[in-house]
């Protein structure tokens, strides 16, 4: 195949990928993301030109570096700055963090749909909502059921007309090393902690974009999504995936009025903190000292209020436990220390092809976003 034919084939492939991912959101970004995270540069003619150009000899021209990023600007305006009267759906909201988020959303004047699986927990949760549970709709829901997601959206539309906020809170804390996990443990954790996020986006995003009033997705990950846990390899893998999914969605949805956040809490005082939640058939007994630790952990309602603060500000990262900051700094320092220096010229075509990953912009904008005046979550 000639270089011209090869370039045309790559360009056609890029166009097909861009079209399948809503091309209008990617034009101007110079990239499209295909299956497996393959980055395809939409300006492939420059890539082909670079491949036809000889590489400068070592010691000749100075190493070519990526172009400087544009001056960072604040990310998209918060789509849900005003929560009153909006509709929220929170998965696994009959207890724990999910219940805390649901109560905080209700306190802000939102209509709240509670996803649950355990009738007894739901019965204990409902009296915690004010005004006789006005504006609270429980729906029994398995987050791994894709047809169930479609039915849920239709039920919410029938009851309230629109859906604005989806909080993917259902999760399984599998206290199993990745090296010793059973296939079923891995599959179950992936289905609930990872795939359920995709299920929610596939079912709910088209509706949010259609009604145009603004929308937001939150995924409850964990500090395990940023730092590996001891004897929790399966859990860590799924929570890192949750963080990456929400980062990728931020890139994809920045040009829309749908925001994204990932919540990475430390310890929260719930009976599920160690025992893994309702959808885990591999639930294990609490380890020694767990009850004492739970009493020192964050109250679920406080965690929920932090999430709602993140929503009204459209924070990409919602972190609640500052004691983990040294560990996160060590991790990122280790990544930077492991990155080799630029020792030889880098082909411009390679830089062009990698541009969308070299500087996708969401991190610079998140830093700038943190420096502007912030809104506060308010109860009504």
Where do the language-model regions lie?
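N-terminal secretory signal peptides
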Residues: 1-22, 47-49
């Amino acid at each position: 195949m000639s270089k011209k034919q090869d370039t045309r084939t790559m360009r056609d492939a890029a166009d097909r990928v861009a079209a399948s991912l809503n091309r209008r959101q990617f034009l101007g970004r110079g990239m499209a993301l295909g299956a497996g995270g393959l980055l395809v540069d939409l300006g492939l003619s420059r890539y082909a030109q670079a491949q036809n150009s000889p590489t400068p000899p070592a010691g000749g021209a100075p190493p070519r570096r990526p172009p400087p990023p544009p001056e960072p600007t604040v990310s998209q305006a918060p789509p849900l700055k005003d929560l009153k009267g909006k509709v929220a759906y929170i998965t696994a909201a009959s207890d724990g963090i999910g219940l805390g988020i649901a109560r905080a959303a209700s306190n802000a004047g939102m209509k709240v749909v509670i996803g649950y699986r355990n009738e007894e927990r739901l019965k204990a949760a409902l009296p915690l909502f004010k005004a006789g549970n006005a504006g609270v709709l429980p729906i029994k829901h398995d987050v791994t059921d894709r047809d169930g997601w479609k039915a849920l959206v239709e039920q919410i539309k029938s009851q309230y007309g629109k859906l604005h906020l989806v909080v993917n809170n259902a999760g399984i804390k599998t206290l199993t090393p990745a090296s010793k996990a059973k296939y079923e443990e891995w599959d179950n954790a992936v289905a609930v902690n990872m795939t359920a996020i995709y299920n929610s986006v596939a079912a709910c995003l088209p509706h949010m974009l259609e009604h145009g009033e603004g929308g937001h997705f939150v995924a409850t990950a964990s500090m395990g999504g940023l730092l590996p846990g001891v004897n929790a390899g399966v859990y860590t893998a799924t929570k890192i995936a949750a963080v990456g999914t929400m980062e990728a969605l931020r890139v994809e949805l920045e040009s829309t009025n749908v925001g994204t956040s990932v919540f990475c809490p430390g310890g929260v005082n719930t009976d599920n903190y160690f025992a893994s939640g309702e959808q885990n058939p591999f639930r294990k007994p609490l380890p020694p000292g767990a009850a004492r630790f739970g009493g020192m952990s964050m109250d679920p309602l406080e965690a929920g209020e932090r999430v709602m603060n993140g929503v009204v500000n459209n924070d990409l990262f919602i972190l609640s436990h500052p004691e983990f900051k040294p560990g996160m700094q060590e991790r990122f320092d280790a990544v930077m220390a492991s990155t080799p220096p630029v020792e030889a010229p880098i082909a411009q075509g390679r830089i062009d092809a990698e541009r969308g990953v070299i500087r996708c912009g969401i991190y610079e904008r998140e830093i700038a976003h943190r420096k502007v005046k912030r809104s506060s979550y308010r109860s009504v």
